[in-house]
Swiss-Prot record:
The active site is at residues 10, 136. The lineage of its organism: Bacteria, Bacillati, Bacillota, Bacilli, Bacillales. Pfam families: GHMP_kinases_C, GHMP_kinases_N. This is 4-diphosphocytidyl-2-C-methyl-D-erythritol kinase. ATP binds at residues 94-104. InterPro entries: GHMP_kinase_C_dom, GHMP_kinase_C_sf, GHMP_kinase_N_dom, IspE, Ribosomal_Su5_D2-typ_SF, Ribsml_uS5_D2-typ_fold_subgr. It comes from Listeria monocytogenes serotype 4b (strain CLIP80459). Belongs to the GHMP kinase family. IspE subfamily. It catalyses: 4-CDP-2-C-methyl-D-erythritol + ATP = 4-CDP-2-C-methyl-D-erythritol 2-phosphate + ADP + H(+).
């Protein structure tokens, strides 16, 4: 059996860290949504008991360091799977960008393996299992728009956000998420209004969504990396209704209602930033799985 499955990137419309927990993680409130910048995974069931990864991108491991490999290994051990799998990944999501590319790939792998290994797991069971690998993966299993709490693994679905344009810009730097969280001072930052964001999404209020964006991690990443702030400022100067860093960075995204204005923001970033994308929110039904027996 062979299948292919799409793994969309995500952005954080709001990201709040409330306090540091006893287990070392931060208690978070994040509103996230998937976008139509996506990787594609191709899975082939093997009779031989092995996991083979083929990543069509540089600098991405094809062994146990890869979340996809970890996802496959976890399912094999948990359900005593004797079959193997070959997974080919066609990468489009930037690496180490704050867009959950690795987490989305792992989520897609879990869903694909559930099919080709005929495990019969529900989406809820897959999401619960995914939390053993990484905090962002549960959201990526569900996709769409959702509130994530706990350390990010507790997911409450929200309506999809209204149609708009999203311009992404990633500078040629990398950011360490553990370092950013370690340096975050939760008592000394402005916190986003998560409830207002949720209400705006439920009401389909795009202006309210724009006004409610916020990310406490900007207080650390922008201070350490001034080029991230310059990208955000440039987006706003070219007409973005809102601009925010996604995750711990370094990618910044702009939210824009009109195509013409979005194109102006996009053109204003090209040449200024190494990687620039113009995308839309992910639509229901786009996260397709194709099966070939």
């Amino acid at each position: 059996m062979k299948i292919s499955i799409t793994a969309p990137a995500k952005i954080n419309l709001s990201l709040d860290a409330l306090y540091k927990r006893e287990d070392g993680y931060h208690e978070v409130e994040m509103v996230m949504t998937t976008i139509d910048l996506a990787d594609r995974l191709y899975l082939e069931r093997l009779d031989e008991d092995k996991i083979v990864l083929d990543v069509k991108a540089h600098f991405i491991p094809e062994d146990r360091r890869n979340l996809i490999y970890q996802a496959a290994l976890l399912l094999k051990k948990r359900f005593d799977v004797k079959m193997g799998v070959r997974i080919t990944i066609d990468k489009h999501i930037p690496v180490s960008a704050g867009l959950a590319g690795g987490s989305s790939d792992a989520a897609a792998a879990l869903k694909g393996l559930n099919v080709i290994w005929e495990l019969g797991l529900s989406i809820e069971e897959l999401a619960e299992i995914s939390s053993e690998i990484g905090s962002d993966i549960a959201f990526c299993v569900y996709g769409g728009t959702a509130l994530a709490t706990g350390r990010g693994e507790k997911i409450s679905a929200l309506p999809n956000i209204p149609g708009c344009w999203i311009v992404l810009a990633k500078p040629s730097i990398s950011v360490s998420t553990p370092t950013i969280y370690k340096e975050l001072q939760v008592d000394n930052v402005e916190h986003p209004d998560t409830q207002k964001m949720i209400e705006s999404i439920k009401n389909g209020d795009l202006d309210g969504i724009f006004a409610s964006t916020g990310n406490v991690l900007e207080s650390v990443t922008l201070e350490k990396n001034p080029q991230v702030k310059r990208i955000k400022d440039r987006m706003l100067a070219f007409g973005a209704e809102a601009a925010l860093m996604s995750g711990s960075g370094p990618t910044v995204f702009a939210l824009i209602k009109q195509y013409s204005r979005a194109k102006r923001v996009y053109n204003g970033l090209r040449g200024f930033c190494e990687e620039v994308y113009m995308v839309r929110p992910w639509s229901e039904g786009e996260n397709d799985t194709n099966i070939n027996n």
